């Protein structure tokens, strides 16, 4: 990964994912955008991302607005291997966005988590789609 290389595993239907992408772009980066719902996942890809982000398949499982409940993946007896298999078959099961930068890999929920992965931020003020301010007029992070 080069110095300014950023990869975002993005779902354009997700407000949090759109906010994170907008933050990255407003900071002057040109990220590689991977629409994982369209492109899908491989097991090695997911295992690598989860290891780098200190996630497990269960902790990365999207439990709302996904087929997780219908697939009985919310039961405590379901193994990480079973969840991983389901994520490969149903990419929407992976929570998003996952962002990779030279500073690390994170599941960026809430959106402002991405700031920890960026060397520089957008000039302020900067607000999410819903109007919540996350960078003030002085360029400082707003903690709520």
UniProtKB/Swiss-Prot annotation:
Keywords: Oxidoreductase, Plasmid. The active site is at residue 14. GO terms for biological process: response to arsenic-containing substance. It catalyses: [glutaredoxin]-dithiol + arsenate + glutathione + H(+) = glutathionyl-S-S-[glutaredoxin] + arsenite + H2O. It comes from the Bacteria. The record marks 10, 62, 96, 109 as: Important for activity. Pfam families: ArsC. InterPro entries: Arsenate_reductase, Arsenate_reductase-like, Thioredoxin-like_sf. Its EC number is 1.20.4.1. GO terms for molecular function: arsenate reductase (glutaredoxin) activity. The keyword Oxidoreductase applies. CDD domains: ArsC_ArsC. The keyword Electron transport does not apply. Catalyzes the reduction of arsenate [As(V)] to arsenite [As(III)]. Does not constitute the major arsenate reductase in cells: essential only in the absence of ArsC (AC P74313). PANTHER family: ARSENATE REDUCTASE, ARSENATE REDUCTASE-RELATED. Belongs to the ArsC family. This is Arsenate reductase ArsI1.
């Amino acid at each position: 990964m080069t110095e300014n290389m950023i990869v975002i595993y993005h779902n354009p239907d997700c407000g949090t994912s759109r906010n994170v992408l907008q933050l990255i772009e407003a900071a002057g980066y040109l990220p590689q955008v991977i629409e994982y719902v369209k492109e899908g996942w491989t097991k090695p890809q997911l295992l690598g991302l989860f290891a780098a982000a200190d996630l497990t398949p269960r902790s990365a499982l999207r439990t709302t607005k996904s087929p997780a409940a219908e697939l009985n993946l919310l039961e405590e007896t379901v193994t990480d291997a079973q969840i991983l298999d389901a994520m490969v078959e149903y990419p929407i099961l992976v929570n998003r966005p996952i962002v990779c930068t030279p500073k690390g890999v994170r599941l960026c929920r809430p959106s402002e988590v991405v700031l920890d992965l960026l060397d520089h931020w957008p000039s302020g003020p900067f607000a999410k789609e819903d109007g919540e301010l996350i960078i003030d007029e002085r360029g400082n992070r707003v903690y709520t």
